[in-house]
């Protein structure tokens, strides 16, 4: 529940969640990873999770890397189709075209200082430490832990062979609510991303596969943001 509560608490704030300096990002990563390691480690110890329950028994193979890239592309295409379809339905319901497209995009500037991405060192941190560790590893461990926990708490619903797939739904919703600062379009998009990443986790029964796909998805987003900012000036920090 904590990611959702933190996301809701930041709704409407103007500053980006990620600091706009290299030092700030390193400090934030250190604090966040330390707190998460302590909290997740304690929870895993109390719950006595097995490695298999967290999908940590499948090693990374060389083909895991290109496959993760392919999954990240598929996720991006899928989310694009979801948003485009939602736009079409909204226009059909309204009976007229929606001209204010800025209101129909995730507010990524609430997560990261887009102007700071012009700094090569800052961008490098986003593409590596933030994408694959702070976001990828941490959030996929959280997802695997939540699925395992739901299976323990409600085995009739979330246990057995298909239960973890049903558990993806509430876990993805919590994941989306953790991105509330991006607006409700961002919540919908990240909920869809959460479903996709959870499906990768369960399909391959491999946490590393999901971490890599998550990391490549985020890294591509950060790499494209400076270019997109030239097309959408509102992305630039005030």
Can you describe what each PLM-predicted range is?
Residues 20-24, 35-36, 67, 130-131, ...:
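Short alpha-helical transmembrane interface motifs in multi-pass membrane proteins
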Residues 37, 41, 84, 222-226:
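Membrane-embedded alpha-helical segments of multi-pass transporters/permeases
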Residues 41-51, 154, 200-203:
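Structural signal for the C-terminal ends of transmembrane alpha-helices
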Residues 1, 16-26, 49-89, 152-166:
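Interfacial transmembrane-helix boundary/kink motif in multi-pass membrane proteins
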Residues 1-48, 102-105:
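Alpha-helical transmembrane segments in multi-pass membrane proteins
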């Amino acid at each position: 529940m904590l990611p959702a509560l933190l996301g809701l608490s930041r709704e409407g704030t103007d500053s980006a969640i990620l600091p706009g300096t290299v030092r700030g990002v390193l400090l934030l990563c250190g604090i966040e990873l330390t707190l998460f390691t302590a909290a997740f480690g304690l929870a895993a110890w109390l719950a006595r999770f097995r490695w298999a329950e967290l999908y940590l028994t499948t090693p990374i193979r060389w083909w895991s890397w290109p496959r993760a890239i392919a999954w990240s592309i598929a996720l991006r295409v899928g989310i694009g189709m979801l948003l485009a379809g939602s736009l079409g339905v909204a226009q059909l319901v309204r009976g007229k075209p929606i001209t204010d497209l800025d209101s129909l995009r995730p507010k990524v500037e609430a997560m990261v200082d887009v102007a700071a991405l012009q700094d090569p060192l800052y961008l490098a941190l986003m593409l590596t430490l933030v994408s694959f560790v702070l976001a990828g590893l941490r959030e996929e461990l959280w997802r695997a832990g939540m699925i395992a926990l739901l299976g323990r708490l409600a085995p009739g619903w979330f246990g057995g062979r298909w239960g973890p797939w049903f558990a993806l739904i509430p876990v993805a919703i919590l994941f989306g609510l953790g991105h509330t600062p991006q607006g409700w379009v961002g919540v919908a998009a990240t909920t869809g991303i959460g479903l996709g990443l959870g499906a990768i986790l369960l399909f391959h029964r491999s946490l590393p596969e999901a971490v890599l796909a998550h990391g490549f998805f985020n890294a591509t987003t950060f790499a494209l943001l400076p270019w997109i900012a030239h097309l959408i000036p509102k992305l630039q920090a005030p």
